[in-house]
């Protein structure tokens, strides 16, 4: 039966099912109607067979596809590198061992890092470089004792034996001369007559607060000043003053070094912010940075240009590289931005402590880097710090060794941006740290 006959029979079936079917039936005799019905039944049966065959074929193909998928090699787990341990007498920063993650190392005070300060997990499941170690260093090699003092080596520490007339943990202070006659030892203000009374034929004497009863060579009683500064200055006793204690008749008072003010409690010292006032002492064109007990005048400069590479100062503390020529690959690998940061720290700060954070932010409508790498790339005291990633977009500069001032440290940290493992740009932050002489 051709396509035309099939369409005719289909229309005939519709007519038979319509309300006017009776009028149509009167035009055909019984034999003609039965023949037409049989033809329609055969047509429907053929359509049903082809439909069933199509369903069966589709099921067969799906089953074959499922078998193929089941036989495929399962997805490989993410590549990771072997776990690393902190070196003896050192510390490890970083606990993720996947590709492109970094792990950082530093040593405890008294030890020096030998080897790389950080390693990166490679795509082949190995670390870059060798795992570093910590080597014991001589505490006296830096000649910490001043004024001819003798350095005595200890385990992770040293002590200075000072010559006559010098004192302090590094022999840096002049000893106070003994009080001459008429000084504190002989000053009438530091010794007073006691209050005495006869009680049942016996004499009882007492002293006012801040004095204690003492006997003289003649057997007489006298009230002698209690030197609170000497008593509480002994090792193991709490400090009366944050800085210096001055003994006074019957009491004491606390003083602060230059650049600090005494607080209301009479014991604590607070740094004076010389930069807060409108009339600070920095010349025009410089910026005043407050430090512990003083201030610094700074005016950071951009790197000098070379050839077609140059920088422009966009703010007092930031430089930006001018656009690179299309064919200058070395230019693109130089820092895109250089920023300057200044920190003021007290001596003997407890470590480890985060000092500085470096981060990136994506511009709306522009794809940002999908990988960042942080590191320390310069400075004069790299061994005191470690740069560690804290999250996907942030790196932290961590102080790992205690600092003792006064001293000025510089450390340059770098943030490199990658897009699909292709280098995009890097940014450098130059951090200058002013360490105070004092621990407050």
Curated annotation (Swiss-Prot):
Disulfide linkage:
81-121, 107-134, 140-151, 145-160, 162-171, 229-245, 241-254, 256-269, 275-288, 282-297, 302-319
**Chain ranges passing through the membrane:** none
Q: Which tissues express it?
A: Highly expressed in newborn incisors and molars. A weaker expression is seen in the brain, kidneys, muscles and bones.
One Pfam family in the UniProt entry: FXa_inhibition
Record's SMART domains? CCP, EGF, EGF_CA
Q: Assembly and partners?
A: Interacts with heparin, FBLN1, FN1 and DSPP. Preferentially binds dental mesenchyme cells and odontoblasts but not dental epithelial cells or nondental cells. Binding requires a heparan sulfate-containing receptor on the cell surface as well as an integrin.
Q: What is the role of this chain?
A: An adhesion molecule that interacts with extracellular matrix molecules in developing teeth and may play important roles in differentiation and maintenance of odontoblasts as well as in dentin formation.
Protein name in UniProt: Fibulin-7
